[in-house]
Amino acid sequence: MHIVLFKPTPYNVRKNTQFKALIADTWELVLDIPAEESPPFGRVEFIKFAVRPTKRQIRQCKRYFRKIVKLEKQFVTCDYAEILK
């Protein structure tokens, strides 16, 4: 799992000052699981925070993300099992 926490810079997007202020106040957490095989494909999740997230918030997001991925794999295998019958 790859984890990236960053604060995006507004200067590459637009020149509007309101938009710059809106972007400058947010933090983004990117959680990524690369593709193991096809299917299932890899998954990327972007989570926005108003302030810098704490380590606890990041751990909670990681747990939630792992649960989602595990559930998706179950759904994918169930669907393929029905198709192959």
Swiss-Prot record:
It comes from the Viruses. InterPro entries: DUF7279. This is Uncharacterized 10.2 kDa protein in sp-Gp41 intergenic region. It comes from Enterobacteria phage T4 (Bacteriophage T4).
